[in-house]
Every structure is written in C-alpha cells, then in structure tokens.
Amino acid sequence: MQVHVVDHPLAAARLTTLRDERTDNAGFRAALRELTLLLIYEATRDAPCEPVPIRTPLAETVGSRLTKPPLLVPVLRAGLGMVDEAHAALPEAHVGFVGVARDEQTHQPVPYLDSLPDDLTDVPVMVLDPMVATGGSMTHTLGLLISRGAADITVLCVVAAPEGIAALQKAAPNVRLFTAAIDEGLNEVAYIVPGLGDAGDRQFGPR
C-alpha cells in the first residue's frame, strides 16, 4: 500500500488547530476544510488529464481537465466535514455515502448506511474520513467499494494510527493513503494518540 504523508507548513498549521483542545466546533470545521483542500491537491497531483481546446479572449489554446473525475465517499459522520471542500475542488465528481458508527464497548464498526453506485468498475474513488484509528470503519468501506468493482481507491485522512495502516494494508494492499500525520498509536480505548479527539463531536457536538 502506498502511504503519503503531506509534509507542508500549511498542512502542519491546520493540523495544529485541529489538535488543539481549545479549538471550538466552528474553528475545527474551518481547519478541516482547509486541510482537506491541501490533501486533495496532493492526491490528484498525478491524476490522468485530457487536452481541452479552448479560446481565450485573445487566442486559441489547449487546456486540460481530469479524464475521470472521482467518486467522493465521505464516511459519516466525521467525513461530512471534508466533502464540501473536496467537491469544490472537484466539481465534476459524484458523491456516495457510507455510514459507520463505533461500538464504544467493543471498538468495532457498526455500519448503518450504504449509498453507493452498484457498479464502480473503472471509477476512481476517494474516501474521506478525518481519522484512521483501528481501521475498522475504513476496511468496511473499502470492502463495499471493492465488491462493486472499484480498483482505483485513494483514502484521505488527517491522522492515521500505525494499527489502522496495518489493517488497511492487509485488507486492501492496492489502496493509496494520503494523510497529514501518522501518530504514535492507539490508547486503551482505541483512540489515536495524540490524535484529535472525536472528530465527529468536535465538528458537530456530542451525540
């Protein structure tokens, strides 16, 4: 599996805001949107493009556009905070949704929503989730995508734990992962340390 850490001063600054416990809900959402855009830039750096003949006010020239805009798949609910900025950068993209909650006793994923196209053959997919902790929610999501024929899958997250990366490597070794940081690991209740806290609660308030 390809793992890319986005090492950029602007990404580090937004990540600092997200980590800071003093950041309120609105500030957290704003920093997440801005960091999502930086992740999108890096993840699409080598995206296939096609030439587009156009005319400027002065002359004819040739521009470019993405050959195949991706399907964006936010993992609810925390991934909701990433989808608007990703969609703004990729306006031709379609959007699917996967909903996965976490059982606080077992730390296992509890799926509750699957809104994806039936056939994803030859469709590039970008999965959006601020955190890859145990990897349970993400491996569930990847399984849904792969079962529908998806083969070109990129995961975008803010922070990832080594345990989660190992789980993804085992479940879907051909996936690409772009993250702003790989943290130390998981604590006794399977939260990433130092992490961000609960990314859903920090965006929208506690459930």
Swiss-Prot record:
Record entry for activity regulation: Allosterically activated by GTP.
Key words of the record: Allosteric enzyme, Glycosyltransferase, GTP-binding, Magnesium, Nucleotide-binding, Transferase
Binding site for 5-phospho-alpha-D-ribose 1-diphosphate: 77, 102, 129-137, 198
Cofactor: Mg(2+)
Residues that hold uracil according to the record: 192, 197-199
InterPro entries from the UniProt entry: PRibTrfase_dom, PRTase-like, Upp_B, UPRTase/APRTase, Ura_phspho_trans
GO biological process terms held by the UniProt record: UMP salvage; uracil salvage
Gene Ontology MF: a single term: magnesium ion binding
Details of cofactor binding: Binds 1 Mg(2+) ion per subunit. The magnesium is bound as Mg-PRPP.
Keyword Repeat: no
Catalysed conversion reaction: UMP + diphosphate = 5-phospho-alpha-D-ribose 1-diphosphate + uracil
Enzyme Commission designation: 2.4.2.9
UniProt enzyme class: transferase
Pathway of action: Pyrimidine metabolism; UMP biosynthesis via salvage pathway; UMP from uracil: step 1/1
Gene Ontology CC annotations of this record: cytoplasm; plasma membrane
Family: Belongs to the UPRTase family.
Role of this protein: Catalyzes the conversion of uracil and 5-phospho-alpha-D-ribose 1-diphosphate (PRPP) to UMP and diphosphate.
Family annotation (NCBIfam families): PRK00129.1 (NF001097), upp (TIGR01091)
Annotated protein name in UniProt: Uracil phosphoribosyltransferase
Organism per entry: Mycobacterium tuberculosis (strain ATCC 25618 / H37Rv)
